[in-house]
């Protein structure tokens, strides 16, 4: 099959197996080039391990620390006629490289919100690893079924308190127009917290602790984004922000649960990046396009893997972590530098459809977006026939 990108709205509906594998190799090469991380984890569970920050966490743990990794994700394998999801192909690529390097890598494909998948992960840890010393929680999902009640909850991306109107870039048509998003009602806020908040992170840690598969001094991290003035109305001071605040509540609760093990739980605040999740959030594509332009000009731009390597070396595995007063690791300090934000804010009102490619790095944004799905990757022949049904040995 010749595989070319099929983009609809903010999602690419197909993926390229070889492009995704090359993407993973590129991230692995970066980690190897940085050198080994001192006193890093040795046995790691990554919940949401197949794309974005979760995948970068798995790569950093394995190739920066020599860790055995168990990944949990919900991805679609390819068939003879249809490509699988990018996350599936990323995981195939990761497994291949881990095997070459003699590193333990196992994966579970299923709904991480369910009790069944938690039990399966615990069984694999008991069988193969004994105990894990790091648990990364990096799930991004629009829906969640509560395992206790069976009720399905859906999240919304809406402001809180009042509707919000702002400039928005339609990445399909490249049209720029004001977009008004109505304020969320109380039920929508509560449902978004239920899906994207810290409850499931807590349930995972509780299940792992109860099963006695957490090592002494085990650490756990969950990821968030805070942003600044331009993104606050749709992010920080919105339904997604309320859900992310719930992560702080969960971190405090988990810390208490891990106290007798000498363990710790922290939220890590990361920078804005092109991911499958961020591309779905109104305003973010335009904001990220401007941010990329300014950060690249200043030489401070980082991708997922650079952020994660730094989180390990400057946050989780150092005696002097960059923590804020809410006990969160801060890896967004370059994005939030006052001078840099001032430049972004100055560009924002001047962007038009005519000057989009001069005033912003939309070209870079779009290239990164396609790369998430394995397209536009250097060294890949996209005219070549490739088999979409790639096998992955799953638990």
Curated annotation (Swiss-Prot):
Catalytic activity, as annotated: a 2,3-saturated acyl-[ACP] + NAD(+) = a (2E)-enoyl-[ACP] + NADH + H(+)
Cited Gene3D superfamilies: NAD(P)-binding Rossmann-like Domain
Keyword terms: Fatty acid biosynthesis, Fatty acid metabolism, Lipid biosynthesis, Lipid metabolism, NAD, Oxidoreductase
GO molecular function: enoyl-[acyl-carrier-protein] reductase (NADH) activity; NAD binding; trans-2-enoyl-CoA reductase (NADH) activity
Pathway this chain belongs to: Lipid metabolism; fatty acid biosynthesis
Source organism, top-level taxon: Bacteria
Chain positions recorded as substrate binding sites: 225
Single GO biological process annotation from the record: fatty acid biosynthetic process
Active site feature: 235 (proton donor)
Site keyed Plays an important role in discriminating NADH against NADPH: positions: 75
Residues holding NAD(+): 48-53, 74-75, 111-112, 139-140, 244, 273-275
Keyword Lipid metabolism among record annotations: yes
EC code(s) of this entry: 1.3.1.9
UniProt similarity note: Belongs to the TER reductase family.
Complex formation: Monomer.
The protein's role, per its UniProt record: Involved in the final reduction of the elongation cycle of fatty acid synthesis (FAS II). Catalyzes the reduction of a carbon-carbon double bond in an enoyl moiety that is covalently linked to an acyl carrier protein (ACP).
NCBIfam families in the cross-refs: EnoyACPredFabV, PRK13656.1
Protein name: Enoyl-[acyl-carrier-protein] reductase [NADH]
Organism: Saccharophagus degradans (strain 2-40 / ATCC 43961 / DSM 17024)
